[in-house]
A protein has these predicted regions:
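Hydrophobic alpha-helical transmembrane segments
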Residues: 83, 112-164, 186, 221, ...
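Alpha-helical transmembrane segments of multi-pass membrane proteins
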Residues: 58, 71-95, 112, 150, ...
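Interhelical loop/hinge segments that connect adjacent transmembrane helices in multipass membrane
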Residues: 137-143, 155-202, 211, 216
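Helix-loop junctions and terminal segments of transmembrane helices
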Residues: 12-28, 104, 164-168, 231-241
Length: 241
């Protein structure tokens, strides 16, 4: 739950890098540069997502072979949910450039509509988990992955259809070393700050697990992260507006 709660924060942190460059060139009325920076940003986020997949999949065996205190009968389910969280992280990364494009174009209404719909789906998920007699952890992972996929499609499909700056066929043609380095240079500090927060929050969750704390302790910590994520989202929304 803690990892899922932080996905919204990760998205907002990553959007800043792309949105800064897109807004600058929108201000200069240089639509071609907007398209170029969007293409480079998307490819950069795709590479970062691939790198994280390799790292987290490599850690899977170590984490679930005894490092984390997980009941034997729940280990397989937890491992599958872990892979779903990795998939959600990938969707979060590659959706960031699209969301940045909406912010740069000041299309805040569409972002708000998507976020409200996302909240409704999560509310329905919570009610569904209470009603169905299924493995709640597995169902939670599957439904959250579907919700993340719907959110990604809402941003990406609309962008491809409505925005001339978003041209999938030109992504690799627009890639340039200079543009990529500028994005990496700015993204480095953003990623560093984002990584520090992720290590702090999820590190505490792992620490609670290793200290053999009761499940209620981790659950309370997860709820606290949900509140923190909501407050961060409100703050980011005000800044975007």
């Amino acid at each position: 739950a803690g990892v899922v709660a932080m996905l919204g924060f990760v998205t907002n942190a990553m959007v800043i890098t792309t949105q800064r460059h897109l807004s600058f060139y929108y201000g200069k009325k240089d639509v071609q540069k907007v398209r170029i920076y969007f293409s480079n940003s998307f490819l950069l986020h795709l590479c970062m997502a691939f790198f994280l997949v390799v790292v987290f999949v490599s850690l899977r065996g170590f984490l679930f072979s005894g490092y984390l205190e997980i009941a034997e009968e729940r280990r397989e389910i937890a491992s599958w949910v872990y892979m779903m969280v990795i998939a959600m992280l990938v969707l979060t990364f590659i959706s960031a450039p699209f969301k940045a494009l909406f912010i740069a174009k000041e299309n805040i209404w569409y972002i708000t509509a998507v976020d409200v719909f996302d909240g409704i789906l999560k509310f329905v998920l919570a009610i569904t988990l209470l009603q169905l007699n299924v493995d709640k952890l597995l169902m939670y992972g599957v439904m959250m992955l579907i919700i993340m996929l719907v959110q990604f499609l809402a941003y990406s499909v609309y962008s491809v259809i409505r925005f001339s700056e978003c041209q999938p066929t030109r992504i690799f043609k627009d890639v340039g070393k200079t543009y990529m380095l500028q994005l990496v240079n700015f993204a480095g500090w953003t990623t560093y700050g984002m990584g520090a927060v992720m290590v702090r929050t999820q590190g505490l969750s792992v620490l609670f697990n290793k200290m053999l704390c009761e499940t209620a302790v981790n659950a309370a910590y997860g709820i606290g992260l949900q509140v923190y994520s909501a407050v961060s989202f409100i703050s980011s929304s005000v800044q975007n507006a």
